[in-house]
Each structure stands twice: as structure tokens, then as C-alpha cells.
């Protein structure tokens, strides 16, 4: 007989219920884990409301305690070689040494399973949930009312953790979307920067070409202006000489007549 995974919650000795489970429903073949085991790290369902069994008019205290324990912490079942085994939560009262041993086992399992001391840690949460369920079991045996009150506290804590986990997952998803959008925006911006740099280089090339053309044009115009000025000066000098000659000839013609 291979029992289920070890737990800090104290159970009685497993009892063989049936030797043939071929005709049982598939659900009975699966290991039924009591609600003190936390769910996977990916989901934290809301714990179900615990329904307490009805008690007779003159209840047996031991019987009533067992029924309350089974309602709070349901027995776990598993199938091995077509044999159905069931294991109920122990109804044996605990002693001070049991509490000390529970603390030692908790510390040992935290160390063995390398649970993180801070931050979110599914392993640490699972072990502390088992420890809390064991404390609920011990208190319920001595006082059912206190046990039921602790059960309400446990369920409230689980609902709060489930709400925080849902909020955390949605925040992570929102952060991932924003990161992807930022990455996409970064890629678009880098592509736009590359296009602008290419356009800048093309404009700089055009500016250099226009500068070269402008310098060549200025040089041509300067040379042409110098040639025209030289030609203009030569024409002026020619006209001055012609004017002097004509003036001398005119004076020569007019002078003898006097």
C-alpha cells in the first residue's frame, strides 16, 4: 500500500474500503486531496463553504467531533491495484509535545523543499496551509466552536489570497501587454529614425551638390564679369582715343580759318 503525499495534517491509519473499483466512477479513481492542500500556483479557486453534518438530539461528543472534523477536513481517498483506500483525519487530541513536533516538522520541510523566506512561494504557502489545518484539527477536538471559527478565518484568508493572486496575474498580463506595446513602439521608432537618417544623408548630399553648383556658377559669373569689364574698359579707352583724335582734327580744321 502506497499512501498519498506526506502532509503536516495528522491522519489515521488508512482503511481498505473496497477491493474492486472497476465499476466505480472515474472520479473515485483519482486521489482526493483534502481542501487543506493549496491549489497550483497558476490558480487559487475560492474555497467551498463547509457544510456541517446534522447532529442528533443527544449527540455523542466523540462522534460529533469526528463528524465535524470530517466536514472541515474531508478524508482523502486513493485507488491502488483496484483497491479503494480511505484515510480520515485523526481525532486524537494533541499534546504539547505534538505541537513542538509539528513546529519541528514545519521547519524541516521548509528547509528540505527549499522554500523561500520572503516573497511569493507556493511551497511555503502549501506547508503553512497544512500546518494551519493541523492546528484547526487540534483546536476542533478540544472545542468545536473555536475550530469552526478558525475555519472561517482560514477560508477568508484563502479568498483574500485568491483575490490578490487574480490581481497579480492581471497586473502581470497588463505589464506584459505594455512591454510588448513599448517594444513595438521602440521598433517603429527605430525604423523611423533609420528612415530619417537616410533622408538626412540624402538631403546633405543634395545640399553639397547645390553648393558645388553654386560655387561653379559664381566662378563662371566672376570670370565672365571680369572679361566684360576688361572689354568695357578697352572700349572706353578706344572711344577716348577716338574722341581725342576727332577733337584734334576738328581743332586743326577750325584753326586756319581764323
UniProtKB/Swiss-Prot annotation:
Species of the source: Homo sapiens (Human)
Family statement: Belongs to the inner dynein arm light chain family.
Free-text function comment from the UniProt entry: Involved in sperm flagellum assembly.
UniProt tissue specificity: Expressed in many tissues. A smaller 0.9 kb and a larger 2.5 kb transcripts were detected at the highest level in the testis, at medium levels in the prostate, heart, liver, lung and pancreas, at low levels in the ovary, skeletal muscle and small intestine. Not detected in spleen, colon epithelium, thymus or peripheral blood leukocytes. The 0.9 kb transcript is expressed at a 20-fold higher level than the 2.5 kb transcript in the testis. Expressed in spermatozoa and airway epithelial cells (at protein level).
InterPro entries (alphabetical): Axonemal_dynein_light_chain
Lineage of the species this protein comes from: Eukaryota, Metazoa, Chordata, Craniata, Vertebrata
Annotated compartments: Cell projection, Cilium; Cell projection, Cilium, Flagellum; Dynein axonemal particle; Cytoplasm
Protein name (Swiss-Prot/TrEMBL): Axonemal dynein light intermediate polypeptide 1
Subunit structure: Interacts with CFAP45. Interacts with DYNC1H1.
Example of a GO cellular component annotation carried by this entry: dynein complex
